[in-house]
A protein has these predicted regions:
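Residue-level marker for buried hydrophobic side chains located in beta-strands
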Residues: 29-31, 155, 231-232
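Divalent metal-dependent hydrolysis catalytic cores, especially in the metallo-beta-lactamase
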Residues: 36-40, 48-77, 85-97, 124-136, ...
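Generic structural signal for well-ordered alpha-helices
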Residues: 51, 75-82, 117, 144, ...
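Divalent metal-binding pocket/active-site signature
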Residues: 91, 99-192
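Active-site-adjacent C-terminal substructures of enzyme catalytic domains
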Residues: 165-290, 295, 302-306
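C-terminal cap of metal-dependent C-N hydrolases
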Residues: 301, 306-322
Length: 322
C-alpha cells in the first residue's frame, strides 16, 4: 500500500505505484525538548524567528531552553515567552555545577532553593515544563522532589554527581539526563552520573551532530540504552545561518564549519542542528524505526503528550507539515 496526498494532507491509501506522493518519509512531527534558538535569534530576543526556523525543519512541538542568567533577567525572559507558540520553557540553569557549566556563565550559577524556584514557577504561570539540576548541589534533592510533585520534568545534567547522588536524584523524581555524555563525566567513568544513567531507566538526551559525542561512544550508548534515547538539537542562534560571531547569554561564541564554541576555547556552545538533521543522522546510524522513536515518541513520553497529533512529510530534506 502507499499514501495518497493532496494539498499537503493525507487523503487516503492506494495501491503501490498509484500514489501521487513522492515523499521519502511520512512521520510524526518532531518534538524538541532542548533548543535555544535559530535563524540568528534566541527565543528570548526573537521568538517568532527561532520558532519558524525550526518549524520549517519539521519541529511540531518546541520547548525553549534558557541558559543561566541573573534571576531578574530570567524572570523577564520567562514572562516574554510564556504566551509564545511554544509548548513551554526549560530552565537549563542556574542550578548546575561550576565544574561542568559548559556555555553557562559560571558567575551566575546558584544553589537550588525551593522558595526561589516557587517564585520562578509563579512567574511562568504554568509555562515552565522542565528544569535541569545538578543533583550534587546542596538542596538539589529537595528541589527535585518539589518540582516532580508539581508535574515539572526534572533533568539532571551539567553535573559532577557520583553514583549515589544520581540514584537519589532518580528516587526524588528525575527522569531525564540533559545532553548525555556532555557536561558530565564521560561514559566509562566509574562512580559517576554516566555509569548510573546507562544502567537505569532515565531518558538520555543525545546531540548527534558528529561533535558532541564521539562515534564510538554513540554506538556504545545506543547499544546499552536503545529505547531511552531522546534526540535534541540544543540549537543556538546560528542554526540556519552562516559561520561567524554570536553570543550565548553574555558569552561570546564563534561558529566555524557549523560548530559553535565559546570564543577562544574548545568548549562546545550548543549545536546548529535542526530536528530534521537529527532525524536523518539517527536514521543513518540506527535506522528508521528508532529515529522516529527518538525524535517523536520518546520526547512525547517525557512530556506526557500524544506523539501522533501531527505529521510531516520529508523529501530531499524539504519538510511539509501534513
Amino acid at each position: 500500500m502507499a499514501i495518497s496526498a493532496q494539498y499537503s494532507y493525507i487523503n487516503g491509501l492506494c495501491a503501490l505505484g498509484e500514489s501521487n506522493s513522492q515523499y521519502d518519509y511520512i512521520v510524526p512531527g518532531f518534538i524538541d525538548i532542548h533548543c535555544h534558538g535559530g535563524g540568528g535569534k534566541y527565543f528570548t530576543d526573537g521568538a517568532m524567528t527561532a520558532i519558524s526556523t525550526h518549524k520549517s525543519a519539521g519541529t511540531r512541538i518546541q520547548i525553549a531552553s534558557l541558559v543561566t542568567q541573573n534571576l531578574e533577567t530570567l524572570k523577564e525572559q520567562i514572562i516574554s515567552l510564556k504566551n509564545q507558540d511554544l509548548f513551554g520553557i526549560h530552565l537549563e540553569g542556574p542550578y548546575i555545577s561550576k565544574k561542568y557549566c559548559g556555555a553557562h556563565d559560571p558567575n551566575l550559577l546558584r544553589t537550588p532553593d525551593i522558595a526561589e524556584i516557587r517564585e520562578l514557577l509563579a512567574v511562568g504561570e504554568g509555562s515552565i515544563k522542565m528544569l535541569t539540576i545538578a543533583p550534587e548541589l546542596p538542596g538539589a534533592l529537595q528541589a527535585i522532589d518539589y518540582l516532580a510533585s508539581k508535574g515539572i520534568v526534572v533533568a539532571i545534567g551539567h553535573s559532577d554527581a557520583n553514583a549515589s547522588e544520581t540514584l537519589l536524584a532518580m528516587k526524588a523524581g528525575a527522569t531525564v539526563v540533559t545532553h548525555f555524555n556532555n557536561a558530565m563525566a564521560k561514559i566509562g567513568a566509574s562512580d559517576s552520573i554516566s555509569e548510573i544513567a546507562l544502567k537505569g531507566n532515565l531518558f538520555l538526551e543525545l546531540i548527534l551532530d558528529g561533535h558532541h559525542v564521539k562515534s564510538a561512544d554513540v554506538f556504545s550508548i545506543l547499544s546499552k540504552a536503545p529505547d531511552r534515547i531522546v534526540a535534541i538539537t540544543d540549537a543556538m542562534s546560528a542554526t540556519g545561518c552562516s559561520d561567524g560571531q554570536y553570543k550565548i547569554g553574555a558569552l561570546d561564541v564563534t561558529v566555524s564549519n557549523n560548530v559553535a564554541k565559546l570564543s577562544g576555547t574548545n568548549t562546545l556552545a550548543g549545536s546548529t542542528l535542526t530536528m530534521l538533521d537529527a532525524f536523518l543522522n539517527f536514521n543513518k546510524v540506527i535506522g528508521f524505526e528508532q529515529a522516529v522513536r527518538y525524535t517523536s515518541l520518546n520526547p512525547a513520553k517525557i512530556l506526557g503528550i500524544n506523539p501522533y497529533a501531527g505529521y510531516i512529510a520529508i523529501k530531499d530534506r524539504v519538510v511539509t507539515h501534513l
